[in-house]
């Protein structure tokens, strides 16, 4: 895949990074459950996805936009009674990142 700086990055490298982000998103669940800070890791994930989007000028806005919206929305799900919504949203994010991986493989 070509960056906006005209630098070619192998698809496998991008896929590995997306899989790493997938794992980081999944780790937010036990972190929140155990009372460990999950907001800073979430901010880092959002930052990296924004950076990837900017760097690669992804043609996958139909995936990136809802992914970032859902991730940003996690910040509002802090109350104990919000955990099931938090969990559901995490799994929706995981599915969207999986969609990014599939699209990179197709190209």
Regions found by a protein language model. Give the residues of each.
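Amphipathic alpha-helical binding modules
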Residues: 68-107
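Amphipathic alpha-helical interaction modules
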Residues: 23-70
